[in-house]
Amino acid sequence: MAWNTNLRWRLPLTCLLLQVIMVILFGVFVRYDFEADAHWWSERTHKNLSDMENEFYYRYPSFQDVHVMVFVGFGFLMTFLQRYGFSAVGFNFLLAAFGIQWALLMQGWFHFLQDRYIVVGVENLINADFCVASVCVAFGAVLGKVSPIQLLIMTFFQVTLFAVNEFILLNLLKVKDAGGSMTIHTFGAYFGLTVTRILYRRNLEQSKERQNSVYQSDLFAMIGTLFLWMYWPSFNSAISYHGDSQHRAAINTYCSLAACVLTSVAISSALHKKGKLDMVHIQNATLAGGVAVGTAAEMMLMPYGALIIGFVCGIISTLGFVYLTPFLESRLHIQDTCGINNLHGIPGIIGGIVGAVTAASASLEVYGKEGLVHSFDFQGFNGDWTARTQGKFQIYGLLVTLAMALMGGIIVGLILRLPFWGQPSDENCFEDAVYWEMPEGNSTVYIPEDPTFKPSGPSVPSVPMVSPLPMASSVPLVP
C-alpha cells in the first residue's frame, strides 16, 4: 500500500480552514471578561478598587509557568528520539496553538457563558492550557507515527471530549481536581493509549533503530524534564482558591516531586545489573509525583503524605518503564512511544484514588467548619453533602474519566485510521525528514521504489543512517 506524505495542499488548507473557523467563532461568541474590559476603569472607581486587585495580577505568574510547561516542557521532553526533534517540538507547538483556541471556546460554552457570550480572562487562559496539556500527554503515545493533519484532528476531538468530561466532573459530580490528575493526566493518557492501539502498526520494527536516543537528544529531553519539574507546583496550584488552598497545593506538589526523584534514581540503579542509571527513567519517572498529587494537592494531605505519594510513584513509574511498557506492546499491541502510561496514566489513577481517600477522611478537626465549606463546598447543591459522599463522587469521577477516554479514543482512532491523512509508512516512522526540510545529509527517508534515490550528502557521525530493510518494499513512500 502506498502512503502519500506530501502535505503541500492538505496541511495548508487544514490549518487555514481551522484558523478561519476560529476567527469567525471568536467574533461571534468571545468577549473580554469585565476585568479585561475597558469598563474596568468605571468598575474600579465605583467599588473603590485598585488595579492590583485585578485578577490578572493574582493569576498571571501561574499562567506563565503553565504556559512554559505546555510549550517548552512537554515539547522538549519528547525530543529524546534521535531523528524526531523537529517534529516533537514543532508539532507540539502546532497542536497546542490550535488547541488553546478551541479550548477557550469549548470550555467557555460550558463554564463561562454570559448573555450568549463567552467572557475571557486570565483564568480562561490557564484552563485552556490545562486542556492542551492533556492533548500533549496523548501526543506522547502516538509520537512519531502520525502526520500533523492527524494531530490537528486528534486535538479537535480530544479538546471537545475533555471539555465534556471536565463539565461532568466539576459541575455535575462536584469533583475536586485542582492539579488535574483525573481530568488532565488520566484522560489524556488513556485517550492516547486507546488511539495508538487502534493505530497499531504491525511492521513498526522497520523503524526500530530510530526509536533509540543519542547523547544530544537525551540532553534536550532533560531540559523539558527540568522545566516541568520546576514549574509543576504552579501547575497544580494555578486555579486553586487564593490563600491557603493555593499555598498548600504548591507545598504538597513540591514535596511529592522531591521524593519522587530519589526513589526513581534508586529503582533505576537497582534494576541495572551494574547499578547504572537509565536516562529514560530520570526524564520521566521523576515527574510522576507531580501527577499523582494533583487531585489532592489543595487538600490537607500534609507534607509527609505528599512525600509518601512521591516515594510510591517513583517506584511504580520506574518499574512500569522496565516491565509494563514492553508487556503492553508485545501482548496488547499498545505501542506507547513515550511511556505515558507510566508517567501520566497510572500516577493519574493513583492521584484520583488518593484524592478520594483524602476527601473522604476530611473532618472538622482537620479543616474546621468554615474550612470544610470553603474547600469542598459542602453547603452547595446538596445539604446532606458529607466528606464520605465527596470521596464516593471522587471515585465516580475517575470512572467517568476512564470511560470517556476509552470510548473517545476508539472513535477518534478509527477516524485517524483513514488512509488519506498523510501518515508515514512503517519504515519511515520517527523520521523528521518525512515532513521537514532537513539540513543536507540528514535524511534517512527510505524510498524503495526509486532506484535512483541517493542520500543528499555524507551521513552525520553522531546520527547513524538506517539501512534499508527487506520488508520495506511492500510499504513504499510516495513523495
From Swiss-Prot:
Primary location recorded for the protein, binned into one broad class: membrane
Tissues in which the UniProt entry reports expression: Expressed in brain, testis, placenta, pancreas, esophagus and prostate. Expressed in squamous epithelial tissues (at protein level). Expressed in kidney.
Intervals, Cytoplasmic compartment: 1-9, 82-85, 145-148, 201-218, 272-281, 325-345, 416-479
Cross-referenced SUPFAM superfamilies: Ammonium transporter (SSF111352)
Consequence when changing V137I: Reduction of ammonia transport
Record's subcellular location: Cell membrane; Apical cell membrane
Reaction catalyzed: NH4(+)(in) = NH4(+)(out); methylamine(out) = methylamine(in); CO2(out) = CO2(in)
Annotated transmembrane regions: 10-30, 61-81, 86-106, 124-144, 149-169, 178-200, 219-239, 251-271, 282-302, 304-324, 346-366, 395-415
GO terms under biological process: amine transport; ammonium homeostasis; ammonium transmembrane transport; epithelial cell differentiation; homeostatic process; intracellular monoatomic ion homeostasis; regulation of pH; transepithelial ammonium transport
InterPro entries, alphabetized: Ammonium/urea_transptr, NH4_transpt_AmtB-like_dom, RhesusRHD
Residues on Extracellular side: 31-60, 107-123, 170-177, 240-250, 303, 367-394
Bilayer topology annotation: Multi-pass membrane protein
One function term, GO molecular function aspect: identical protein binding
Gene3D superfamilies from the UniProt entry: Ammonium transporter AmtB like domains
Glycosylation site list: N48
UniProt modification remark: N-glycosylated.
Gene Ontology CC entries for this record: apical plasma membrane; basolateral plasma membrane; cytoplasmic vesicle; extracellular exosome; plasma membrane
Mutation effect (F235V): Reduction of ammonia transport
One Pfam family it belongs to: Ammonium_transp
Assembly and oligomerization: Homotrimer.
Biological function: Ammonium transporter involved in the maintenance of acid-base homeostasis. Transports ammonium and its related derivative methylammonium across the plasma membrane of epithelial cells likely contributing to renal transepithelial ammonia transport and ammonia metabolism. Postulated to primarily mediate an electroneutral bidirectional transport of NH3 ammonia species according to a mechanism that implies interaction of an NH4(+) ion with acidic residues of the pore entry followed by dissociation of NH4(+) into NH3 and H(+).
Name used for this protein in its record: Ammonium transporter Rh type C
Gene (name only): RHCG
